[in-house]
A protein has these predicted regions:
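Internal, charge-rich low-complexity segments
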Residues: 324-354, 542, 550-581
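General beta-strand structural signal in soluble alpha/beta enzymes
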Residues: 162-166, 188-190, 210-214, 221, ...
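Secondary-structure transition/capping motifs at alpha-helix termini
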Residues: 204-209, 238-244, 251-252, 276-281, ...
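Glycine-rich, acidic/polar active-site loops that bind/position phosphate-bearing ligands
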Residues: 318, 418-439, 443, 447, ...
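FAD-binding subdomain of flavoenzyme oxidoreductases
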Residues: 241-251, 257-437
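N-terminal flexible segment immediately upstream of the FAD-binding catalytic core
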Residues: 2-201, 218-258, 286, 409-410, ...
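Flexible, glycine/charged-enriched surface loops at secondary-structure junctions
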Residues: 158-166, 281-286, 364-369, 373-381, ...
Length: 581
């Protein structure tokens, strides 16, 4: 991906006593400093900071800020950009007005009074003139690039799927993070999987950064354009969902249930299709009702069922993607162990490359990777390992290609399930070890009676406060920690005994346990886990999450450490506020 500014400019957080907002028409989250860095450069901000202490009337500064404000409001509003592209006369008048303001600043210069100060003003004016000229030239550049893109890409998809309009660009400037950097040049919404490779190749020839996008539910900013010369390829029209099929996978001697999906299929639809056939789709992230299959693969998504069947990687039989070279790549798992991939001594994959038409085979490769490579000892999923032993597509967040479809292995859910909700009111340090105790007990129970822990989720007190959690215990007040888990098996008595023992473990750690048997009651227990959007409301609607993996034995230490950081930062903020009074 391209970056919006030089790294040095981003890291050089020069002393900025306040997020100054002197630039007019700036209704974005960017401060004056950030706008000046983008339009004029770091040197201009240094000059402005120095001249700010030497203002007399401030008129020249106001006129300069008006110039920057006019440029900025157009740059951040695709509708204004389209209007100015369609009206050359209006655009010419705007540019003339910008030059007029700069000329008025020029007239107010007094080199005879303070030559050093005047030299800085001259340097600032030169940077502003360059910015206005670049602003003027940008319209011709954008118009030409749009013409080339429309001509090139319309050979491979319907012209209505090539979107330059303001609504499409605004809709694709951010994802669930609400972080906005640049508006994409174009949004592509292909009708079929077959169109993908040619579109990718066309974008590469045009010099565009390609950003795959599905449901836009990510909290890591993976679908956010960082450069204006970018094309967002939206896969939401790729919604073909096959029937559940029992097929013999390569290297296996029996048929297994699978389902084929295109990248734009919403995760919950796949889960519903599997459930209708009496089976389970193991990939169930919190965003299942909005996220798409392509993103699940790109992020190697998990969910509560990952305890039992692993993440997306563990459950993929095969997948299809477009490489950055515009070629088709089909990846097929060989000798699938139908369980967690790290339990297999060797995980083998066949990679078949085809040209953009998908008809001519180019080459075939084979990857044989030790299963243990895919997990980190003591942690499980290693979120820092984007290379993942060279396996394409999975956990790459769209950086090595665009996933278009996949075939998944489905599983049989045991007949009886109970959901337990455990509320802990003691100190977090005392409550957290119960997670390890429950896990160890359930893993031993699985070997002894076949009863399985099909999911286990941890909710801390800050999350509970954000989602408005309703305490089930009669104690009142919010718990310090909540655990929600599914216990499942074919023997109803064994499941009931296991659930009771889990509740007993919670009782020994200042906790209380509640068990749900009916499907509706179980769904209510899990409802609070899906209220992730409430966190965004609780944090001023801006949320970037990078996944972290915590070793369970050190969970208590982690919880206390995070709480300490929160308290220290809160106190520091209060002290600074008090000092300003």
């Amino acid at each position: 991906m391209n970056v919006p500014l030089a790294l040095a400019a981003l890291t050089a957080q020069a002393a900025e006593p306040a997020r100054l907002r002197e630039i007019p028409y700036n209704y974005t989250s960017f401060s004056d400093r950030e706008i000046v860095l983008r339009l004029l450069g770091a040197r201009a901000w240094e000059i402005l900071a120095q001249l700010r202490t030497e203002r007399h009337t401030g008129r020249s500064a106001r006129m300069l800020y008006e110039v920057l404000g006019d440029i900025w409001v157009v740059r951040r509003n695709p509708y204004l950009q389209d209007d100015l592209l369609d009206n050359p006369r209006r655009r010419r008048l705007l540019v003339e007005a910008l030059h007029h303001r700069l000329a008025e600043i020029e007239k107010r210069r007094t080199p005879q009074d303070d030559p050093a100060r005047d030299a800085m003003v001259g340097e600032l004016l030169a940077a502003a003139r360059r910015a206005v000229e670049a602003f003027d030239r940008s319209f011709a550049k954008v118009a030409e690039l749009r013409r080339r893109a429309a001509r090139s890409l319309s050979r491979h998809t319907h012209k209505d799927n090539i979107k330059f309009d303001g609504l499409s660009r605004v809709s694709h400037v951010t994802d669930a993070t609400d972080w906005r950097v640049e508006f994409p040049l174009v949004v592509l919404t292909p009708d079929t999987e077959a169109e993908m490779a040619a579109l990718v190749k066309g974008c590469i020839e045009l010099g565009l950064t390609i950003i795959p996008r599905g449901g836009g539910t990510g909290y890591t900013g993976g679908a956010i354009p960082l450069d204006w010369k970018s094309a967002v390829i939206n896969t939401e029209k790729l919604i073909t969902l096959g029937a559940v099929e029992r097929i013999r996978l390569p290297g296996l001697d029996r048929e297994v249930p699978t389902i084929h999906t295109e990248a734009g299929v919403v995760t919950q639809r796949v889960a519903d299709a599997a459930e209708a056939a009496g089976l389970v789709f193991a990939c169930d992230p919190t965003s299942a009702e909005a996220s798409c299959i392509g993103g699940n693969i790109a992020m190697n998504a998990g969910g509560k069922k990952a305890v039992l069947w692993g993440t997306a990687l563990d459950n993929l039989a095969s997948w299809r993607m477009v490489t950055p070279e515009g070629e088709w790549l089909e990846v097929t798992r060989l000798n699938h162990n139908l369980g967690k991939i790290h339990d297999a001594e060797l995980a083998s994959f066949e990679l078949k490359y085809f040209d953009a038409s998908g008809q001519r085979a180019l080459r075939t490769e084979r990857l044989d990777i030790p299963g243990a490579t895919f997990r980190k000892a003591g942690l499980g999923k290693d979120v820092t390992d984007k290379f993942l032993a060279g396996l394409p597509g999975v956990q790459k967040e769209g950086c090595d290609g665009l996933i278009t479809s996949a075939r998944w292995v489905l599983h049989r859910m045991p007949e009886h399930t109970r959901t337990v909700c455990l509320e802990f009111f003691g100190h977090a340090k005392d409550a957290v070890p119960s997670i390890v105790e429950i896990k160890d007990f359930m893993f031993a129970e699985a070997r002894r009676t076949g009863v399985l822990l099909a999911g286990l989720e941890h909710l801390d007190d800050r999350y509970l406060r954000a989602v408005g959690y309703t305490t089930k215990s009669k104690r009142g007040g919010l718990p310090k920690m909540v655990l929600i888990g599914d216990i499942t098996g074919d023997d109803p008595d064994a499941v009931a005994r296991a659930a009771s023992e889990v509740v007993r473990i919670a009782n020994s750690r200042s906790g209380e346990g509640f068990t749900a048997v009916a499907a509706d009651a179980r769904k209510k227990f899990w409802a609070d886990r899906k209220k992730t959007a409430a966190i965004s409301r609780h944090t001023n609607a801006f949320k970037i999450n990078e996944d972290v993996v915590i070793p369970l034995p050190r969970m208590a230490e982690y919880t206390d450490g995070i709480e300490r950081i929160n308290i220290e930062l809160s106190l520091r903020n209060k002290i600074e506020l008090a000092g300003e009074l």
